[in-house]
Amino acid sequence: QINILVGTIIASFQASAVSYLYYADRIYQINLAIAGIAIGVVILPQLSKYVHLKKKTKILVIQNKALELSMFLSLPASIALSIGSEQIISALFGYGSFSEEAVYNSAKALYYFGLGLPAFALIKVFSTFFFANHDTKTPFYISLTSVALNIFLSLYFFKSFGFIIIPIATTISSWFNSIVLFIFLKNKNLFSFNKIFLIKFFKIIFASIMMGLFFRFLVLFFENQLLYDYYLKSLYLIWSVFLGFIFYLLLSLLIKAFKYEDIKLKY
């Protein structure tokens, strides 16, 4: 939220830039809420319980399953947002006084925000691992460093790149945040990957890439409708997203990257 506030202030120095960022932000925040925030909220009570009971095996299972689910949700969303950013913005907001230039610039912002979506999800999940161990200081100080990096990049490169440096800086600082959180978790011996996660993670990557190719085909197939069909383009977007989701879900089930039980997060 601090990054968004800082980005908005800096973007106000360029005409219409605040609006471009606002519309892009609304879309990726929905995905973030599903892929990261919700999972973090659900697993915190369970993790805290088993940390108190010192059941390391249970803790490891919950951590890896939570990370697995966050990647299962955020990776395909990141790919879809990056591939279809212009069509998504056009279908949702490209009406009335929202010009083609506004669609193009908002889509560019969404593209770079989309690249950072897995990092945003990782931050929420990794932070929960610290909170369950009654450590709020470490993620707080790492977040401050990340915000400082974001501000520096945004201010230093704003004159050269304009408003688009803001989502780029946000994504870079978010990946920095997630990587540093992971390093501290490992150093404090609060987390480790298990074999099941590593196997499923590569399956999730494969399924996400295949979904991305399929979604790209849909976006190109319906491109004219998504960009120019004033009355029905939102329906074409819903249909494309639905088909992409079904394709991803079925492929994930087929290659055993995902099971129905995984979504329950109860162990």
Question: Where on the chain are the PLM-derived regions?
Answer:
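Interfacial/gating helices of multi-pass transporter permease domains
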Residues: 9-31, 101-107, 239-240
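Interfacial segments at transmembrane-helix termini and the short loops linking adjacent helices
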Residues: 84-116, 227-231
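Small-residue-rich midsections of specific transmembrane alpha-helices
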Residues: 28-46, 70-79
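Short alpha-helical transmembrane segments in multi-pass integral membrane proteins
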Residues: 62, 68-83, 160, 164-189, ...
